[in-house]
């Protein structure tokens, strides 16, 4: 690479008059390229300083000449001179504008909401009136629901199910009456001497049901009959309770006799056949034979023999025989200790 040749300006030292002093280097004339710093300062001092009051007076007529624009309510103009000085004020003003817009929107929405509420109230009144007319036409049933029945359409549901509910109540009442009559008839067959027979028969069910649903007088008669039925039931319970207790006692004694007497099965069979027949009789007759036979049954009970001696009694005549038992500690190897001496399993194989 060849370097380019530098252009050098020759210096004429003849201008400096060949003097050795340092003042020779200072030129009397200022070069044209450089600007003097002292000249602009002098020019600035020559100009008069404008007063602030004069500037304000000049700005005011200019603003008055320009026509003012009418702004919407709640907004105001910001002068151009105040913008750079107040930056935080702009954010606050924007926030206030947003609030005003929101308030204006809410004011506009309020009348629409009120109109909607009025329309809904009118509709609900119309629905309520129509539902009342339907209920009066179909049945005089009134719904038990106190919660906003107009909005939930509860009146319609109750109106549709009125007929089924009344029929179900009638059926339930008739079934209950029929069951009570059956129970009374069964009790009167067993204890005819002590108890009185009921005044009404099962063939009168339909008549009683119709009377029960038609008028209040028949309802009072039905309540009187119910009270009579309850009194008859109490009497039956009192009569049946001692009989049931006697039967339970006789059955428990029969079971004790069957379990205790093992040596005479034939006698047990004859007693078990005769006992059910006697149970149906009065309680006095059932107690006497049981009391007579109880000592004989106690005498025939076998004495208790311990289970360990049962095996020896069969082989020998003596009831108690001592059986010799060897302790298993000799042949058993407990643990895995190497020092324990163990007998060989096959002594013949080791000897050979």
Swiss-Prot record:
GO MF entry, a single one: DNA secondary structure binding
One cellular component term from this protein's GO annotations in UniProt: chromosome, telomeric region
Positions of modified residues (Phosphothreonine): 66
Feature: compositional bias, Basic residues: 1-10
InterPro entries: HR_DNA-Binding_Protein, RAD51_interact
Biased composition (Basic and acidic residues): 39-72, 229-247
Superkingdom assignment: Eukaryota
Location of this chain's protein in the cell: Chromosome; Nucleus; Chromosome, Telomere
Modification Phosphoserine, positions: 19, 21, 120, 124, 280, 327
Acidic residues bias locations: 188-221
Impact noted for substituting residue 326 to R: Does not affect sumoylation
A biological process term (GO) from this entry: DNA repair
Chain residue ranges for the region called Disordered: 1-78, 115-144, 162-323
Cross-link annotation Glycyl lysine isopeptide (Lys-Gly) (interchain with G-Cter in SUMO), location: 269
Stated consequence of mutating residue 333 to A: Strongly decreases interaction with RAD51
Function: Structure-specific DNA-binding protein involved in DNA repair by promoting RAD51-mediated homologous recombination. Acts by stimulating D-Loop formation by RAD51: specifically enhances joint molecule formation through its structure-specific DNA interaction and its interaction with RAD51. Binds single-stranded DNA (ssDNA), double-stranded DNA (dsDNA) and secondary DNA structures, such as D-loop structures: has a strong preference for branched-DNA structures that are obligatory intermediates during joint molecule formation.
Record protein name field: RAD51-associated protein 1
Gene coding for it: RAD51AP1
């Amino acid at each position: 690479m060849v370097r380019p040749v530098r252009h050098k300006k020759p210096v004429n030292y003849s201008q400096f008059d060949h003097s050795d002093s340092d003042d020779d280097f200072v030129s009397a004339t200022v070069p044209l390229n450089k600007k003097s710093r002292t000249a602009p300062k002098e020019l600035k001092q020559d100009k008069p300083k404008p007063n602030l009051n004069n500037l304000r007076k000049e700005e005011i007529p200019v603003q008055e000449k320009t026509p003012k624009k009418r702004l919407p309510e709640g907004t105001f103009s910001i002068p151009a001179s105040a913008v750079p000085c107040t930056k935080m004020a702009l954010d606050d003003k924007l926030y206030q504008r947003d609030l005003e817009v929101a308030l204006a929107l809410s004011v506009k929405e309020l009348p629409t909401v009120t109109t909607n509420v009025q329309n809904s109230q009118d509709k609900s009144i119309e629905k309520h009136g129509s539902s009342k007319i339907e209920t009066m036409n179909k049945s005089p049933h009134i719904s038990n629901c106190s919660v906003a029945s107009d909005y939930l359409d509860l009146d319609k549901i109750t109106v549709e199910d009125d007929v089924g509910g009344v029929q179900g109540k009638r059926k339930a009442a008739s079934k209950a009456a029929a069951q009570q009559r059956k129970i009374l008839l069964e009790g009167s067959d067993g204890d005819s001497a002590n108890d009185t027979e009921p005044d009404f028969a099962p063939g009168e069910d339909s008549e009683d049901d119709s009377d029960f649903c038609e008028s209040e007088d028949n309802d009072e008669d039905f309540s009187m009959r119910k009270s009579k039925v309850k009194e008859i039931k109490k009497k039956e319970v009192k009569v049946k309770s001692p009989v049931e207790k006697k039967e339970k006692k006789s059955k428990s004694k029969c079971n004790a006799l069957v379990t205790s007497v093992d040596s005479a099965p034939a006698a047990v069979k004859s007693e078990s056949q005769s006992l059910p027949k006697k149970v149906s009789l009065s309680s006095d007759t059932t107690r006497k034979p049981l009391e007579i036979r109880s000592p004989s049954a106690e005498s025939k009970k076998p004495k208790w023999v311990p289970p360990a001696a049962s095996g020896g009694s069969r082989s020998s005549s003596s009831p108690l025989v001592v059986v010799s038992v060897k302790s298993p500690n000799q042949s058993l190897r407990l643990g895995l200790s190497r020092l324990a001496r163990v007998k060989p399993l096959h002594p013949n194989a080791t000897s050979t």
